């Protein structure tokens, strides 16, 4: 586009590659700087090439509020900032909102960097992604905080060049299908989760270079691993040298003070109704998708964008007298529309905790158009249940079965995320009831239930081997736990469970309707046993039975819809996984008998605090 077109589309919220105009760009022998600061009194460029404030480079402002200047002295790798004079004469140093790289901390300057036009070698993956999509594919996500998965030999976070050599082989070995990273965009603290961003186009310096991350994604794709990233379009850090009140007025944030300030997180909320902010944010999302070939974006804190009263501070009702943030609603619909028009096979996932807005319904039906939503209700209920003493679980059996009431209202991801293993909530293993043996047994049972329940899967790093302590973002995982036999067996179990999930289409082919599940018995409160069948579109099935008390049940009998010879294909209490069973249940033939609405029954021994999954080895005539 011409500069005139760039400015016009920026102003109407339709410039979706804003980084091609704003920011710093190499032009012949010079670098051109452009920044949007419509209400600034003056803006200058300062940096290594101006001896900082000694020889500031004056910028000129156009009618759209964009300031521009060219420098023959600037070089790639130079540090720079914008020196912004606000109304009233206050002068502040600001980062470049469009910078693609930032100075290593404690510095906060932007870096002049020309991004390479990578020759990608992941064509097979990208072609398969386009051809097969993802809705009817296995999705099992390993959630990672890049700074604390594993440290290097000097105790520093690994760069993506190092993670390529360590994390990717681990993902392959553990049979995950995708990896999801907590924010990789520039943020101001090394020791943080990364959710208060300062650079929406800048790759976080701690983790290496943009080129290293491109190579990491390419290597993942060559190993059949998809890559997802977390993205935070609702709020941003309130540091004075970043986006906050950029030109002295509400530039990126709301004009209204209470709407602008996020009291819960000590941040500022984007004005999602402002056209220029929409151009900025949608450009950021597309930049990560297109420049880094990522396979999906998880949008953080969607509830904060949808409801005016979600925060802890004061709020005012909208023009209809209710609590809906209409700007947030329309922005999210626009975001998904734009991305799906350009990249229909990139996943859009919402972290959203309410049930009043249709998150994954299509735009034509009034939904937000996301592909998936984290199932926060299921996660809270099921963790509460598994923490409870089994003696009382029969009285709270609805915590396990309630999800069947809304299971297909949305397309869900069943997530045990980083949020569940911090702030005194305990690690996944430590949440489980009982002594150490029963905690591991409970965790194996829980993970089997997650895999068999309809919905895509996510597990936070360290939970796969039963790390005992909570996640510490300033340290690496407790890899030393793997010196313990029980942790080794837990890791082996997760590895085999992940492969089991991939191998059985019944567990992922139909995740969005009751065509993929048949509830056998959700009323067995007294024994606290849940059973259902998962089905695919070819007629195959798996019988899934979960014993949620530490009582072995010999000759357990259950009705089945198909006569046949059944084979146990998963038993969470096998010795190799840390249990006590040396052998599987024997291959078993159904009996002709009435059991509820079924004409055939299957009898077997149900392991204590265990899950037992069966497949039909040979069908018999009824």
UniProtKB/Swiss-Prot annotation:
Disulphides: none
GO cellular component terms, semicolon-separated: cytosol
Domain of life assignment: Bacteria
Gene: glgB
Keywords: Carbohydrate metabolism, Glycogen biosynthesis, Glycogen metabolism, Glycosyltransferase, Transferase
EC number of this enzyme: 2.4.1.18
SMART domains according to UniProt: Aamy (SM00642)
Metabolic or biological pathway, per its Swiss-Prot or TrEMBL entry: Glycan biosynthesis; glycogen biosynthesis
InterPro entries the record matches: A-amylase/branching_C, Branching_enzy, GlgB, GlgB_N_E_set_prok, Glyco_hydro_13_cat_dom, Glyco_hydro_13_N, Glyco_hydro_b, Glycoside_hydrolase_SF
CDD domains associated with the record: AmyAc_Glg_BE (cd11322), E_set_GBE_prok_N (cd02855)
Purpose of the protein: Catalyzes the formation of the alpha-1,6-glucosidic linkages in glycogen by scission of a 1,4-alpha-linked oligosaccharide from growing alpha-1,4-glucan chains and the subsequent attachment of the oligosaccharide to the alpha-1,6 position.
This protein's record includes keyword Zinc-finger: no
SUPFAM superfamilies, per database record: (Trans)glycosidases, E set domains, Glycosyl hydrolase domain
Name by which UniProt lists this protein: 1,4-alpha-glucan branching enzyme GlgB
One annotated GO biological process: glycogen biosynthetic process
Catalytic activity: Transfers a segment of a (1->4)-alpha-D-glucan chain to a primary hydroxy group in a similar glucan chain
